[in-house]
C-alpha cells in the first residue's frame, strides 16, 4: 500500500506543470492555506507552471478576485481555469441558440459579454446548469419535475 505523501517537494522535480484544485487545497472557503501557497510558489520559482483548476461556475477572473479576498498568493499560480471558463466557450459556440440558465443570479457572470439569448425552459435549445436557484432552501429533489421535462425534450 502506498504511503502518505506529506509534502509536494520530493515529487516536484518530476513535473513541469501542476494542475492544482482550489477548494480544500489552496483555501478552505474562509482563508488561504499558507503552506500550500508557499509550496506552489517554490515550485514556480524552480521553473514549474501552476494552473489552478476549479469547478466554480464563474470565469477565472472572478475566481481570482475571490482568491485575492481569501489571501491566496498571486505568485503561487500562473493561471486559473474554471468550469465557468469552459461554459463560456460552449455558450459562445452556441450563440445562435437559446439558453435556459438553471442557477442563482450570482452565477450570471458566466454570460457577461457574450451574445446570448435567454429563453424559458420550454423554448430553450439547451440548458446551462450552474447550481440551484436558491441553495439556502432548495435541494436537488426540488428540481425533479424540471429535470423530467428536460429529459423528455
Describe each PLM feature range:
Residues 1-153:
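HAD-like aspartate-dependent phosphatase fold
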Amino acid at each position: 500500500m502506498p504511503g502518505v505523501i506529506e509534502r509536494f517537494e520530493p515529487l516536484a522535480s518530476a513535473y513541469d506543470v501542476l494542475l492544482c484544485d482550489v477548494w480544500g487545497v489552496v483555501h478552505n472557503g474562509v482563508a488561504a492555506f499558507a503552506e500550500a501557497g508557499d509550496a506552489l510558489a517554490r515550485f514556480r520559482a524552480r521553473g514549474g507552471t501552476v494552473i489552478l483548476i476549479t469547478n466554480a461556475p464563474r470565469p477565472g477572473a472572478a475566481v481570482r478576485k475571490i482568491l485575492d479576498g481569501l489571501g491566496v498568493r498571486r505568485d503561487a499560480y500562473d493561471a486559473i481555469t474554471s468550469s465557468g471558463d469552459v461554459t463560456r466557450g460552449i455558450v459562445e459556440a452556441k450563440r445562435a441558440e437559446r439558453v435556459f440558465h438553471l442557477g442563482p443570479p450570482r452565477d450570471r457572470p458566466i454570460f457577461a459579454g457574450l451574445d446570448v439569448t435567454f429563453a424559458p425552459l420550454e423554448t430553450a435549445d439547451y440548458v446551462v446548469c450552474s447550481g440551484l436557484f436558491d441553495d439556502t432552501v432548495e435541494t436537488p429533489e426540488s428540481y425533479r419535475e424540471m429535470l423530467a421535462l428536460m429529459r423528455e425534450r
